[in-house]
Amino acid sequence: MNIETIKSVYFVGAGGIGMSALVRYFLFKGKVVAGYDRTPTPLTETLIAEGAQIHYEENIDLIPETCKDKERTIVVFTPA
């Protein structure tokens, strides 16, 4: 995989301390970043303010269309 060909990154568990660092990294790299977390927190609100699209409902319709492109999107998740 070439990270330069990736357009968007979707995170499951975006509000975790390790995941949020990756969210910020990909935002810095200019990628479309979106994700899901169970509850809003000051950290997820900060990520939204920095440009991430985060939702708190388990609803596939809330995933941005750009993140549904299998060829140019990576999904990052944690078992935590």
Language-model-derived ranges and their functions:
Residues M1-A80:
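N-terminal leader/targeting and accessory segments in enzymes
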